[in-house]
Amino acid sequence: MCLIALAWRALPDYSLIVAANRDEYFGRPAAPAGFWDDHRNVLAGRDLEAGGTWLGITLDGRFAALTNYRNPSDRKTGVPSRGGLVSDFLTGRSGPLEYLQDVERRAPSYNGFSLLVGDSDALYFISNRGAGAPVRVEPGIHGLSNHLLDTPWPKVEKAKARFAERFKKTFDAASAFELLSDSQRAQSGELPSTGVSLEMEERLSAIRILAVGGYGTRCSTALCFGKDGRIEFHERSYREDGSVSGTVSYRLTLSRERGRASSRRAGSRPPRTPLPAR
């Protein structure tokens, strides 16, 4: 992922709402979001090159998402894929804090990353380019791009502000996708300096990156965890020319027994109205 906006325990009827864009080279093979054959409680896209993922959930209410930390000068070769940090949490049994304490020990062996993991009880953040220790995420609206949580880059600040405007009471997938489709670039004077050229900084400053040189926004994801046990998960995938290549939508209902849930795929379009809150 390269942009994540989220509301954690900030709305009365939802524990978590997420709107996220994944930016990647279009030549890197990936599968769209779906339930994994080898881990049937995991709903996520999949990197077909390394086997991990960038964002996903489980039927017992776990959530994880990752962004790369942008600093080209310290990139190493021959290191583990960062997508495994997401998939390992989703397929494992460790709690969020316990898992990130283990990640902290292994973090130096990876290229730069920022990672969010959580369940119904808590949400935590860690980066191997920050303080290094897991941090409990406080209730509120947060944003993450290719740096630390809530670093005030223009795209992060814009996404957080628009997120707050759109999700005051209820979740709506169409509003999330509208937010994630903004391809306007920031002004040059507002740009961070992350070790790439000014031209590249400008390109990367948009919420949705239109493809140039085979790189851009590959998919958008909108999801919510309702406090009544309901989940919505929607993903929209893009071709290199910017057109939509496909959408998937799921409505999930968690049972009271941990680890079990019923699910229904909602079709190729996100629902036009949100699920009713109880």
Show the residue positions of the predicted features.
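N-terminal nucleophile
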Residues: M1-R260, R264-R265, P270, P274-R278
